[in-house]
């Protein structure tokens, strides 16, 4: 049984793992660079509520800090973590929940509009080349795809969720084998849910485009 679990990052996965740890009555510390959990996805107001949920559940929440190093024993087991504020924590399980980086390195030299944020494509999942011209026979789907969304001022957005990958692949496959009149757009309404600390958090739409938080 771990003395203490350290979770690095407090996005959805990190927060859900922290919730499970508390359900199992495991001591858990969450280290987060930002001001609050979930703040990147849901904003500061919801982030403050998420922080309160964690603290009330007994999570040792540390915000505004990073993990600078891990220390182990002679057998290679982690025993301590050093935080950027100088704190040293006794831990024996560390979970890195730092998000994902899109794998576009293999596209180097392909002359596509690809980079750190993914591969740019149109609503029909067709990739753009480096000059911003849409291609006719290269299609993109999944987390790596970034397309303009009509509901959000045509801002290029990627949706990192399994259902977007499934539905995007369906649209891409349809458009690969269809003539122009048979092609259709992939314009999903962003949505997800997350169960943590006895609360089901559900989001529909994009928080930054909301008019009011109540």
Show which residues each predicted segment covers:
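Well-ordered beta-strand scaffold positions
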Residues: 66, 86-87, 199
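A structural micro-motif
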Residues: 3, 26, 59, 79, ...
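Flexible, glycine-rich phosphate/dinucleotide-binding loops
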Residues: 14, 37, 70, 104, ...
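FAD-site-proximal beta/loop scaffold in flavoenzymes
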Residues: 1, 74-77, 82, 88-164, ...
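Rossmann-like dinucleotide-binding cores of NAD(P)H-dependent redox enzymes
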Residues: 4-8, 12-69, 161, 185-193
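Mid-to-C-terminal Rossmann-like scaffold of FAD/NAD(P)H-dependent oxidoreductases
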Residues: 144-214
């Amino acid at each position: 049984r771990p003395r203490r679990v350290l979770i690095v990052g407090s996005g959805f996965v990190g927060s859900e793992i922290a919730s499970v740890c508390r359900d199992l009555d495991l001591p858990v510390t969450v280290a987060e660079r930002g001001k609050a959990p979930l703040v990147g996805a849901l904003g500061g107001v919801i982030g403050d509520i998420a922080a309160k949920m964690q603290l009330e559940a007994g999570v040792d929440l540390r915000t505004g800090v990073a993990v600078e190093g891990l220390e182990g024993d002679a057998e290679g087991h982690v025993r301590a973590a050093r935080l950027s504020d100088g704190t040293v924590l006794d831990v024996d399980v560390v979970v890195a929940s730092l998000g994902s980086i899109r794998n576009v390195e293999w596209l180097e030299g392909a002359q596509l509009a690809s980079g750190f944020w993914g591969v740019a494509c149109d609503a029909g999942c067709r990739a753009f080349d480096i000059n911003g011209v849409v291609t006719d026979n290269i299609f993109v789907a999944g987390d790596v795809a970034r397309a303009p969304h009509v509901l959000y001022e045509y801002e290029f957005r990627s949706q990192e969720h399994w259902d977007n990958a499934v539905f995007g692949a369906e649209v891409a496959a349809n458009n690969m084998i269809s003539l122009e009149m048979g092609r259709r757009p992939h314009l999903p309404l962003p949505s997800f849910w997350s169960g943590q600390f006895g609360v089901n958090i559900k989001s529909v739409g994009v928080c930054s485009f909301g008019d009011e938080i109540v």
